[in-house]
A protein has these predicted regions:
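Sec-dependent signal peptide recognition
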Residues: 2-9
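Hydrophobic h-region of N-terminal signal peptides that target proteins for export
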Residues: 10-17
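Acidic/His- and Gly-rich active-site-bordering loop/insert found
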Residues: 24-27, 31-152, 156-180
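Metal-dependent amide/peptide-bond hydrolase catalytic core
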Residues: 49, 260-263, 267-476
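Sec/Tat-exported extracytoplasmic proteins
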Residues: 65, 69, 77, 81-84, ...
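Histidine/acidic-residue-rich, glycine-tolerant segments that coordinate divalent metal ions
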Residues: 120, 142-157, 173-297
Length: 476
């Protein structure tokens, strides 16, 4: 491994999402190449010029976004907010949202990739010729609360904001006879696993989409630096299902206790914690452990979220924990099935899109602007979609309350939330407009995204090499 001074490591940590020493060592050359790329395309300066330029068509689109919001979509946001439904159970929300889309002339297909509350809504320009396919993510799931579901992450505003952008742009395209397709992807259950976007991605639901935009409520107006990262560490969601044999507890030797296996496994994982690097996070519960004290439990389930800043070391942790589960099963005469039901990974951030979104947020006088770029994080929470399709998540201030709080939920139905969601819609519409009408910008976006994707693969190879002494050859 290369040697780095403390100063250089601190500097790198401020610029990137790479938080561990190994990550920073692996990423050092990659970061230089990212900086060279950004110097070449000048995303900040270019975005400010694009936003400042007089453009009657763009201004008409943004005005139409505002009219759509004021006339109908603000009330739709409040309606979804007042009727929260948790992930994979958003039936009424989907019914309401898709009926609104149909009223605007968008086709709707409910049920995607085996998910009943996922949908795709599509509008195709009547103009002849091949145009881009523009995508928007729409979320609508609520959080699980101790008393009731609630929209503490303000997902109630995301779909209406996306609708305002999409409809305004569709009307412009039809009037100007511009070819292209607009797709709104209804993605359920952002707040719980298994991650719906990964399921939809692997099923090919997003295939053929050229660009995806989305928005999300936040406590400041900001943007991310270009690079690789994820909001909440790389995650493996894993269930360990132990199966034994029931028996009366007075003759427990006739059974095989699945709960004993689960508890032994859970305890072993606790003993493993000091053997992992300090950045490792392991969070687990035992949601199933038998149904009656007088019956030997023949089924028990341990559910873990295994987290680490990079996916290479995460795979090592996953393998060690899986071995602990197999050992517990072997020791207790039970069987274990390992169900890896969800993954979240580093995503790719595209500077040209992030800076354009931020330039428009500034132009539109968004509140609580943080001028400092934040650490890279993919525009959607799983990371997988960002590696294939360029996109951006618009972040405009919509509440000062903590995330996942009842106060933020209430703010989503007040002026502070309404203002933030409307600005989200305008910024998304502006980004889509430029991508549709500016070939130079479109080429820059795809060139940057492809370059970043290649650099990300180089980064993963560098990580494997950096861990080789500690973990052995992880490429096998």
């Amino acid at each position: 491994m290369k040697n780095y001074t403390i100063v250089s490591l601190i500097a790198l940590s401020l610029l990137t999402a790479q938080t561990t020493t190994v990550e920073r060592q692996a990423a050092s050359d990659i970061i230089k190449k990212i900086d060279q790329l950004q110097s070449k395309i000048q995303p900040t300066q270019t975005a400010r010029k694009m936003a400042a330029k007089k453009d009657r068509n763009r201004d008409k689109i943004l005005k139409r976004v505002e009219t759509l919001w004021d006339d109908q979509l603000r009330d739709l946001s409040d309606h979804i907010g007042q009727n929260p439904e948790i992930g994979f159970q958003e039936y009424e929300s989907v019914d309401t949202l898709t009926k609104v889309l149909q009223s605007f002339g968008f086709s709707v297909t409910i049920g995607q990739a085996g998910l009943e509350t996922a949908f795709v809504s599509e509008w195709e320009s009547p103009a002849k010729g091949k145009g881009p396919t523009l995508g928007l993510f729409a979320e609508y799931d609520a959080l699980r609360g101790t008393k009731e579901p609630f929209h503490g992450c303000q997902h109630n505003g995301q779909s209406p904001a996306a609708f305002a952008s999409a409809v305004a742009l569709a009307e412009f395209m039809e009037k100007q006879k511009l070819p292209g397709t607009i797709k709104i992807f209804g993605t359920p259950a952002e707040e719980m696993g298994p991650p719906a976007k990964v399921i939809m991605f692997e099923a090919g639901v997003f295939d053929g989409t050229d660009l995806i935009v989305r928005s999300h409520g936040t406590d400041e107006t900001t943007r991310n630096k270009p690079g690789f990262g994820v909001c909440c560490l790389n995650i493996n969601m894993v269930k360990y299902i132990f199966e034994g044999r029931p028996a009366h507890q007075r003759s427990s030797w006739n059974g095989r206790n699945a709960l004993t296996a689960a508890v032994q496994f859970y305890t072993t994982v606790d003993h493993l914690r000091p053997t992992f690097r300090p950045e490792a996070v392991i969070q687990g519960v035992i949601p199933e452990g038998g149904v009656a004290p007088n019956v030997v439990p023949d089924r028990a389930v341990v559910d873990y979220y295994i987290r680490y800043p990079d996916e290479v070391y995460l795979a090592h942790m996953d393998a060690m924990i899986a071995n602990a589960a197999r050992g517990a099963a072997l020791a207790t005469g039970t069987k274990v099935t390992i169900d890896r039901y969800g993954e979240y990974r580093d995503g790719i951030t595209v500077g040209s899109l992030e800076e354009l979104a931020f330039a428009y947020a500034e132009k539109l006088n968004a509140p609580e602007i943080n001028p400092e770029p934040q650490r890279p994080a993919g525009y959607e929470e799983t990371g997988f979609v960002t590696r294939k399709i360029p996109g951006v998540s618009v972040s405009v201030y919509s509440s000062s309350a903590p995330g996942h709080s009842y106060e933020r939920w209430l703010d989503s139905m007040k002026e502070v939330g309404h203002t933030g969601f409307l600005l989200d819609a305008k910024v998304m519409a502006a980004i889509l407009y430029h991508y549709l009408t500016d070939d130079s910008f479109k080429k820059t976006v795809h060139m940057e995204h492809k370059t970043m994707a290649d650099l990300f693969n180089n980064y993963l190879d560098a990580l494997k090499d950096a861990y080789k002494e500690e973990l052995g050859d992880t490429s096998k």
